[in-house]
Amino acid sequence: MIINDRRCLRAAGAFVLVFAACGSIALGYEHPPDIVLIVADDLGWGDVGFNGRTEWSTPNLDRLAGQGVVLKRCYSAATVCAPSRAAFLTGKYTIHSGVRRNDEDLPAEEVTIAEALRSHGYATALFGKWHQGKPRGGRALPVHPMDQGFDEFFGYTDATKAWEKYPKTLRDGRREVAVSGYIDDLLTDRALDFVGRRQEKPFFLEITYVASHFHIAAPAEEVERYRGKFRESDPARPLQATYAAMVTRLDRNIGRLIARLDERGLAANTLIVFTSDNGATFEKGNGGASSALDSNRPFRGQKRTLWEGGIRVPGMARWPGRIPAGSVCAEIVHLIDLLPTFLAAAGATVDPSWHVDGVNLLPVWERQARGPQRTLFWEWQSEGYDQLAAIRGDFKLVVTRGGKPELYNVVTDPEERRDVAASHPDLTRQLNDELKAWLETEVAGPVGGLDRR
């Protein structure tokens, strides 16, 4: 049975809080860790220094990565924004979360990371882009994050408004308020305030930046740093310089957040995870900047495809004393793993009734265990696209528009150029059969007595 009554979660809070506190003490902490999830928007795997970018600098992210673990095989759950975010919020595949397209709502009965951690005594906040569906059924607004476990919210509920990098208004809780400034600066300011107000409760802070989603824009002083450094098709509109400036400003704002954690003496017991919701886009609103800069290098594809460039994303995690500094994780990390991993960090476990697909990877990041042997799945059948994918170990199966299954060794062939299906017929057949069986688990009707859609 799915837990679908918010009162059930609140009623369980006292018991769960005791359990969480005991778990944290057993792990050597008197206080459960603060947890910070930083999500970039359409940032390519190759856009950050810790993955080899040299044309611009990301010193704060690189420093964080050096103090923790770089997740070399980190995968988003989807190739576009809303399905990806719903998946990591719930720990579920897109076919189980109820959000498979950009215009779908997160079902109200789904338990999010914020709800799960709040029931464990955490204060929760989301600052940034929510993007969990357009209004439906006569509602005036999309499903609100404060109805899904967040105590505080500041940002966009309407994803199309996130195209505006200098917004005139944002949502502060449920109110629309006037604002002025560059969006990622505003979000960081609010995060600094939240961290500064931290009291006795541990907190879960999710900050979903707008960089580097189109339309691209950045503060003039950042753009000037890169003007003339790239071969622009139109020097009067330095799109590549602007893209580099967006990523630089993103890194600068993350540095501000880390500095505030340090100032408050919180960094030593804070788990920080950084990633992107999907790969970089080569679409027209981006002006071709990501394509010219090869943001997804060395991978094939982009946002809205299930090639590595669409779903393999930058990732790193830092938790001093728990995650060894300077480590690299070559195990597969899927963003549906965040919910169970965060709960484990808080000293708790996932309620089986939530039917979470992800697994706790904290022992893997701590180098206490190998990654689980599992097959992971993706589907993208919307907006004129039709692609399916499955990964097990080094191998990835891709099926495009119902065509012949293609098999790639994405460790030795990360660009997915050499189809080895013919030389691995049994594995190709097994993965294709598993993919078909997975699709049959789609949740399209009533679950736990509730009509999910």
What does each model-identified segment do?
Residues 7-15:
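Sec-dependent signal peptide recognition
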Residues 2-3, 15, 20-406, 412-453:
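Formylglycine-dependent sulfatase
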